[in-house]
A protein has these predicted regions:
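A short glycine-rich, aromatic-capped structural motif
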Residues: 25-87, 104-106, 185
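Bacterial N-terminal signal peptides that target proteins for export
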Residues: 2-11
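Bacterial N-terminal signal peptides
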Residues: 10-18
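Functional-site microenvironments in short loops/helix caps that host divalent-cation chemistry
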Residues: 40, 44-46, 86, 91-99, ...
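Intrinsic structural disorder/low-complexity segments
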Residues: 8-9, 21, 147, 160
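Bacterial Sec-dependent signal peptides at the C-terminal "C-region" and cleavage site
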Residues: 18-26
Length: 230
């Protein structure tokens, strides 16, 4: 689901994407290998929202590495220590290992730039096509857990919809087949792309429109309906 709706909390997270080879030094972010491959992006004939169609073939031509979890408060605050005063706003994201929230698109880009300079590698946000490919991890169902959420994911979403204080600790639910956590729910995740309609044609490494009004976020959050978690 290409989610740009204005949710009640400005909940976003920067997923890290690394295009260069690993160095011997341990990186700040745990990265997992995502192989090159092809998949069908979007959804069609399954009760999808208008902007999830048409389903179309996308080829990801090169393997890449992606953060195993969403960026945490502790990780982000090495870059921007003053962000700590925003912890706990609206009863979420209070602990070091909670996913960082209250991060704008530009904040996410700046964090990737800072980390690139710090580690001597190239980090950036994923494109929407890369994000969905990584999330699906070879599946063709509505979620990587099947056509419904796992019981753990369901419990987190049910609690959160009461707007009570909830934990945004990363890695609370089982990862997908690629080893990525929290791709459905917890916090929304920024992508590089401007929001725009899908092509009906087969594409290779698409990057979205050249310009637009909104940037894409994917994965939904702890208090968005299931349809926004895709």
């Amino acid at each position: 689901m290409k989610n740009i709706r204005r949710i009640g909390l400005p909940i976003v997270a920067a997923f890290l994407f690394q295009t260069s080879a690993f160095s011997q030094a341990k990186p700040l972010i745990e990265l997992v290998e995502i192989p090159a491959g092809s998949y069908y992006m979007g959804s069609e004939g399954k009760g999808e929202n208008f902007d999830e169609a048409p389903s179309h073939k996308v080829n990801i031509s090169k393997a890449f590495r992606m953060g195993a979890t969403e960026v945490t408060n502790a990780q982000y605050e090495l870059f921007r220590p003053e962000h700590k005063k925003l912890r706990g706003k609206n009863n979420v994201s209070t602990e070091d290992d909670d996913a960082v929230v209250n991060v704008s698109y530009q904040d996410a880009v700046d964090f990737c730039q800072w980390l690139s300079e710090k580690e001597g590698k190239t980090y950036r946000l994923p494109t929407e096509a890369e994000w969905e490919y990584a999330c699906r991890a070879g599946t063709y169902t509505l979620f990587y857990t099947g056509d419904g959420l796992s019981s753990n994911m369901r419990r987190n979403q049910t609690i959160a919809r009461d707007y009570k204080a909830v934990s945004l600790k990363v890695g609370q639910t089982r990862p997908n087949a690629f080893g990525l956590y929290d791709m459905h729910g917890n916090v929304e995740e920024w992508c590089l792309d401007w929001y725009g309609p899908y092509s009906a044609e087969e594409q290779t490494d698409p990057v979205g429109p050249a310009e637009g009004e909104f940037r894409v976020t994917r994965g939904g959050s702890h208090h968005t309906p299931d349809e926004y978690l895709r």
